[in-house]
């Protein structure tokens, strides 16, 4: 997660907080939403992103890889921050479309950030990428296509 956050120029602590809120930092979590979409993995990448991600060779099964999922999640967050500015609305947009839901989500992330110890006291996460080539696909600049 740390490398993904740094690569996409977003806060490492913020990415950790979002992963905690989304999945409890568990890579194998899959959640079926009431609208029929699915949230996948560590950063709970919504299945609506699959069309965009497929253009870069990233499939649904690739999102089960912790490292790939972290890079995609950090990229989504960076796009929100670029589009909406460095504010809590952009953080909330990671999870929700409407302003009220965005703010409720952002408050959860904020509370999690306040409970998270400084990164220097956190143990390093294990590197578990099974397919390092997938990360190379994410290292190319991705363009925002208004997805989500």
Please place each PLM-identified region on the residue numbering.
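Catalytic glycan-binding domains that act on GlcNAc-containing polysaccharides
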Residues: 1-127
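Intrinsically disordered, low-complexity charged/polar segments
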Residues: 123-148
């Amino acid at each position: 997660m740390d490398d993904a956050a740094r690569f996409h120029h977003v806060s490492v602590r913020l990415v950790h907080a979002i992963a905690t809120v989304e999945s409890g930092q568990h890579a194998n979590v899959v959640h079926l939403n009431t609208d029929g979409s699915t949230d996948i993995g560590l950063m709970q990448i919504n299945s609506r992103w699959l069309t965009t991600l497929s253009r870069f060779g990233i499939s649904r099964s690739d999102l089960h890889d912790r490292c790939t999922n972290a890079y995609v999640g950090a990229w989504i967050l960076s796009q929100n921050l670029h589009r909406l500015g460095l504010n809590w609305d952009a953080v909330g947009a990671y999870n929700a479309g409407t302003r009220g839901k965005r703010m409720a989500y952002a408050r959860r992330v904020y509370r999690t950030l306040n409970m998270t110890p400084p990164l220097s006291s956190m143990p390093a996460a294990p590197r578990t990428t099974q397919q390092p080539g997938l990360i190379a696909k994410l290292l190319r600049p991705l363009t925002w296509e208004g997805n989500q």
